[in-house]
Amino acid sequence: MSLAETATPQENGLTGRTVFMLATGAGFAVAAIYYSQPMLGILVNELHAGVSTVGLVPTLTQIGYALGILLLAPLGDRHDRRQIIILKGVLLTLALLLSAFSGGIIMLLVASLAVGITATMAQDIVPAAATLSPAASRGKTVGTVMTGLLLGILLSRVLSGFVAEFFGWRSMFGAAAIMVLAITLIIWRSLPAIPASTTMSYPALLASMRHLWRDYKPLRRATLAQALLSVGFSAFWSTLAVMLHEVYQLGSATAGLFGLAGAAGALAAPLAGSLADRRGPELVTRIGTTLATLSFALMFLLPLLPVPYQLALIVVSAVGFDFGVQSTLVSHQSIIFSLEPAARSRLNALMFTGVFIGMAVGSALGSVILEFAGWQGVVVMLTLAGLGSMVVRWMSKKLHP
């Protein structure tokens, strides 16, 4: 039994206040990846760069996040996660300040990569919560922290859209730095130490991930299905602001409002966890991938509708696919966390590396397709990504991983 498993979570037990703190920390950290998306139209004008070049801002952020998860998150099994969370919080604050004071697109791109790498403190918080929580309430605790993380993803767009339009894009990055620093200080004062679960060296940790990937087919299936959904998820949100500006002449604040619709998807986290406990996570992944795909395909109807109904349909689609994507994500975490408790950080790192590679691909392809094939071309891409995830989840004859 690992050190993490023998640590006494009941003694270190998480109060409701501590769980809320961790959920807030995860939300603030992961939000840093998405602040740029609603302001892409503003960045095109103010930095005098092309749409495809500015599209590299969220792309590099997500690539940085994927690299940080793959190369840094496994350290959570080797070192005190509290120390890692605090260090990343300080570095993320500095990266956000660099974004705020960027003098041009090149500096902003470099800062975006740094933001992505350090924002992986969110992926240290989730397994930290799972380790500190007693087994009887672990699912509820992780679900609550994931709700904070998912709200951070979606509400970040709402906040960013308004702040960028009325106070400027630099103000948004500056405010984000203050929020991250504040929650980091609170975590420093409140979170207990978290014992390591292994004494393996860093090279051995990385090498063990290859064996985990090879040994666990459920991990591979979960990663592939979630990565495909992430392609569609990211392509939609990274191109929405530009499309709304070009087609409907709507500002970044309006684009941010669509994040409120998508925030409804965060409510799927506890609901999906509860259903997975009763009926098994495999069933929930099938429902989630199907709902996301149908919601993507619904936007093929846009050319047939008048403008007000087109906007309403986009809102309905956003609610539907976000609910499907987040339900599938929580169920996939339920699957992989049960595989090998002592390797939770590494298992989580492997799956989320795939997720954010998918997001980076979605951002990059979405921007290019929007520029050359329009919004309907983007919808084709979203639907194909959803269909791919459905194939992965429905190809199994079992309802359990």
PLM ranges: what are they?
Residues 67-105:
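Conserved MFS/SLC helix-loop-helix module at the cytosolic interface between two early adjacent transmembrane helices
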Residues 112-149:
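Cytoplasmic helix-loop-helix junction between adjacent transmembrane helices
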Residues 283-331:
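C-terminal transmembrane helical hairpin of 12-TM major facilitator-type secondary transporters
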Residues 5-13, 191-224:
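Juxtamembrane intracellular "pre-TM" segments in multi-pass secondary transporters
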Residues 69-80, 268-281, 370:
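Helix-to-loop junctions at the C-terminal end of transmembrane segments
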Residues 107, 137, 143-191:
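Helix-loop-helix hairpin linking two adjacent transmembrane segments in secondary transporters
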Residues 121-133, 325-340:
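Intracellular juxtamembrane helix-capping segments at the cytosolic ends
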